[in-house]
Amino acid sequence: ALAPFGINACTLTGESAPDERRQVFAGLRDGSVDIVLTTPEFLVCHAPEFAATDRIGFVVVDEAHHIGLSRAGHRPAYAQLGSTIAQMGNPVVLALTATSDEAVTSDIDRVLPVAGHVVDDTMRTNLHVVDQRNLRNRGDYLATLVAQGEKSVIYVSSREQSVALARNLRKRVPQMAPLIGFYNAGLSRAERTRVEELFRTGAIAVLVATSAFGEGVDIPDIRNVVLFQLPYNEIEFNQMSGRAGRDGKDARVHLLFGRSDVKHNDRILQDMTPDHDVLAEVYRTLRTWQRKTPGEFFEMADGELARIVSGAGCEITAASAACGIAVFRELGLIETHVAYASGEGARMVRVKEGAGRVELTDSVRYREGLGERDIFKAFYEWVIDCDCARLEQRVSGPITPQMKPLHLR
């Protein structure tokens, strides 16, 4: 889109081939590449290469509220952007988000070199809440809604649920089956792009998705957003609801979640920050594997670690294993790095010998995970009992800090 204006924009992500990466970095150095679209994870990992080009003068951080949500392992690269940007010579930074309360804004200010704030409190009066919280037969309600054929996004709280609900709807509403798809972070980037394009063009009319769908996606004619299950916090609630009616025409946000969802979300949060006994078993397993290769790094993916620990009688998920790796690394109990072969990365682990006694609560990652549970508790207590008028007001407006805006001339 920018080529007619003489601007060369390229994309770099973890899925970019080595040759493509070399070409883009070479283009940055010689001036033939003007803009690089990338992810925080790629930027943090490749900060030295970006810095070496000596041409980075402007950095845009979209969906900057993730800086405030980077606790408990939620895209932690966002929290590292400040030091990464400093490595590149402190270029001008523009941070953008529609969901930034005072706490999140403070986090953004702390991490990024932000000099001022521009706040837009515009209300989206075309959005209307359909309150069906705690509905006993929400599956029937959803099937009836899908049968109407309007472009709709249905949000659920896990990847597995996105696949299961899409299959269920295809069976219950067979006339719509070819038009029902699913979207989650487990799909490859190419698959996600393909599904998004099918939904944009109308080849898919109903999309069952996790929160992975939405941010950065501007599809104007979504008439229905369905919160089938309970979101995890207020920012996620607003981000999901805000996908509806971006063309300015009337759109509806259907609230189908209820108290029965609380236990499901609690379990997922528990998996992401498991208790002491689970993490102790994960650490014992790592030490056992280390004894097979004394002093050397060994390959250990989250899923494989979860399988081994579960096989020993302590059932855990890959999310719990990932938490253990992150916490142990922070506490200085292990070292990790990624080894690449044929373009594929593998996580390598080495358990440090002679590490002293540590407490889990010495880990910021662990404490933040516990904090996520508190945030969820406060959110569900509010959203379950809040009256519909207040919920519609929340859906219609952005989450902004209560501060004096910077007036530009």
Q: Which positions does each model-derived feature cover?
A:
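SF2 helicase catalytic motif II
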Residues: 47-92
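Conserved nucleic-acid-binding Ia/Ib motif block in the N-terminal RecA-like helicase ATPase lobe
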Residues: 1-38, 117-118, 179-183
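Conserved phosphate-coupling serine/threonine residues in phosphotransfer and NTP-handling enzymes
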Residues: 39, 97-99
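Loop/turn-to-beta-strand initiation segments
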Residues: 32-35, 55-58, 89-94, 151, ...
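Interdomain hinge/linker at the junction between the two RecA-like core domains of SF2 helicases
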Residues: 84-87, 92, 99-147
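Conserved helix/coil segment N-terminal to the catalytic DExD/H
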Residues: 16-58, 66-69
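C-terminal helicase lobe
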Residues: 149-162, 176-211, 217-409
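Catalytic P-loop NTPase motifs of RecA-like helicase/translocase cores
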Residues: 43-44, 66-75, 102-103, 216, ...
